[in-house]
Design a protein with these regions (language model features):
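N-terminal leader/targeting signatures
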Residues: 25-28, 120
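Periplasmic c-type cytochrome electron-transfer domains
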Residues: 45-480
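Bacterial N-terminal signal peptides
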Residues: 28-40
Length: 480
């Protein structure tokens, strides 16, 4: 789960981690495709254990096909603390990180839980699940209203105060739920997936769980504890509990395994799916835009190579769909984009403060076959600007204490951690694998589907995608 811990500066650092893959245990019982987690407490057992588990590569249906998770431990252990109630309000880590929903949550899944429980499932708690912690939840009708943002966009309310040392002050609040103030802004954010964590360079959207001179393992341990004390309203975890949760999480790799049009994503030499992903090397700074942190090699914009084997495929049906995926991958790697107005790039001294940077999608999504930024590099791509505000989002007016400049934003982002004016609206770029399972997209759930994501970038950066290019990009994103 995301935490409400407030702290930390980001840093660029090297952190290599090794992985070993163990063989899968024998599966004794079959599990039906598409069942929710509560019906997937598998009674299959390896020879050496009586613990229930989910088998590796169990497919879960999603709108684009199906995804699966591979654990380097051989199976997904449902007795881990990740699946235990460690707080006081009934929540568990998997309340907001469900394998059938890409280890996040979706509006569809949340609406199903609401219908089954009348809005009393542990995910529906006022401390951060409701639009306001003061919301009326006395009746089913009241709960449906109170949890409207969670139900419609799959967003959790994160409460963070304006830092005491901030370069700015809050001078106006427009909160449709009547709660937010300088003491606690209401920030509606999507829970990040608790899988593929070996590719992380930054923990949390705003990096508040990324600590200077520490490993990602340390950061995740602190995040797990913050989640229990915050979201689950419990006591601090023991060191052993933290370690077991992090060990469980960092063994997980999730990716799409089947596309409704292209078919199996390992067919004809393709390298889709979580098993291939688990063998992908990573370290902090790999293929960084300013040069690889270990080898010093220049940045390679060809970040994705999963579907290279499908280049040149022709035909109809699944072969035609595979050709579209390969074209989309190439577009992601090579389509020229004139990047402008992006804080963290165009106002970044390391780039020379250029008005325009000629790049591609991979300028920001540079981690090979994962797609996040391989170093801590939060960016403001305009998602929190006032002209993108919807009526269900709070709006904050901030004023620079030195210059008097004002800015309206729905979420100050990284600035609430650092206090820096230039960090307003900056967020990390997430890992791009397993996307099809966990719409909506962006930190605030503002893009309901892949079409909305591509349309946003096309409009925001003036890319000028053709209709065919948009379709090919979407075909590629669906298969990740």
């Amino acid at each position: 789960m995301n935490s409400v811990h407030r702290h930390a500066k980001q840093t660029r650092r090297c952190d290599s981690r090794s992985r070993s893959v163990r063989p899968k245990p024998q599966i004794v019982f079959l599990i039906f495709l598409g069942s929710v987690l509560t019906t997937l407490i598998v009674t299959a057992r390896p020879a050496t254990s009586n613990s229930p588990f989910l088998p590796n590569d169990l497919p879960f249906e999603n709108p684009s096909g199906s995804h699966a998770t591979f654990s380097t431990t051989g199976s997904i252990d449902l007795t881990n603390e990740f699946f235990q109630e460690l707080g006081t309000n009934g929540r568990r880590c998997d309340s907001c990180h469900r394998p059938e929903e890409g280890w996040s949550i979706t509006p569809e899944g949340l609406q199903e839980r609401f219908q089954k429980t009348g809005g009393t499932d542990p995910v529906f708690r006022t401390n951060d699940g409701a639009d306001s912690p003061n919301a009326d939840v006395s009746t089913v009708k009241a709960r449906r209203k109170a949890y409207s943002m969670l139900l419609s966009k799959g967003v959790i309310r994160v409460g963070i105060a304006i830092p005491a040392n901030a370069e700015f002050e809050l001078i106006a609040v427009d909160d449709p739920y009547g709660f937010a103030s300088a003491a606690e802004l209401s920030l509606f954010r999507r829970p990040l997936p608790s899988t593929n964590l070996n590719f992380l360079s930054t923990v949390m959207w705003d990096g508040r769980e990324t600590f200077p001179d520490q490993t990602i393992h340390f950061d995740l341990s602190d995040q797990a504890n913050s989640a229990i004390t915050g979201h689950a309203q419990g006591q601090s975890l023991t060191d052993a509990q933290r370690e077991r949760i992090v060990k469980f999480e960092t063994a997980l790799f999730t990716a799409q395994i089947h596309d409704r049009d292209a078919g199996e994503l390992t067919a004809r030499g393709a390298k889709g799916g979580p098993v291939n992903l688990s063998n992908q090397p990573f370290y902090i700074g790999i293929n960084d835009i300013f040069g690889d942190s270990k080898t010093g090699a220049a940045f390679d914009p060809t970040v994705f190579s999963i579907y290279d084997a499908w280049k040149g495929v022709s035909g109809h049906g699944s072969d035609g769909a595979r050709a579209a995926v390969a074209r989309g991958e190439q577009l992601f790697n090579t389509k020229l984009i004139n990047i402008s107005g992006v804080s963290g790039i165009n106002d970044e001294p390391a780039f020379g403060n250029p008005l325009v940077v000629k790049g591609t999608c991979t300028t920001c999504h540079d981690t090979p076959n994962s797609g996040n930024h391989s170093v801590a590099a939060p960016l403001d791509i305009g998602l929190t600007d006032v002209d993108r505000r919807t009526p269900d989002m709070p709006l904050y007016t901030l004023r620079n204490k030195t210059t008097g400049e004002t800015r309206l934003t729905t979420d100050p982002g990284r600035a609430l951690i650092t206090g820096r004016w230039t960090d307003i609206g900056r967020f990390k770029g997430p890992i791009l694998r397993g996307l099809a399972a966990r719409a909506p997209y962006f930190h605030n759930g503002s893009a309901k589907d892949f079409q909305a994501v591509v349309d946003f970038y096309d409009s925001r950066l003036g890319v000028g995608f053709t209709g065919q290019e948009k379709a090919d990009l979407i075909a590629f994103l669906r298969t990740l």
